[in-house]
């Protein structure tokens, strides 16, 4: 089992816009165990999308499927306009 966290550093004041995009897209992705997190302390304007995947092949399939769906593309349209930078963390669950 893997936990994948996509960490987005939003442009100042734009985290809410990014949250709105993901909140619109999440219901379209049924069967995906995912969470949407925001900073409480630390770096301002940080949004984290956390996804649980059985293995890395399943995660790669999720990315491919998500990227090919027009409804998800429409929901996420323009979200990169609100992003300054980002990175991905991948963790293997051991207990």
Language-model segment annotations:
Residues 1-72, 78-95:
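Short S/T/G/P-rich N-terminal loop/turn motif that feeds into the first structured element of a domain
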């Amino acid at each position: 089992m893997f936990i994948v966290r996509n960490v987005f550093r939003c442009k100042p004041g734009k985290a809410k816009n990014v949250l709105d995009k993901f909140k619109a897209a999440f219901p379209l992705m049924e069967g995906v165990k995912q969470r949407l997190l925001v900073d409480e302390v630390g770096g301002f304007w940080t949004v984290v999308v956390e996804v649980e995947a059985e293995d890395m092949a399943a995660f790669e399939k999720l990315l491919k499927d998500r990227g090919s769906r027009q409804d998800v593309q429409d929901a996420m349209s323009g979200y990169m306009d609100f992003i300054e930078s980002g990175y991905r963390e991948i963790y293997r669950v051991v207990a």
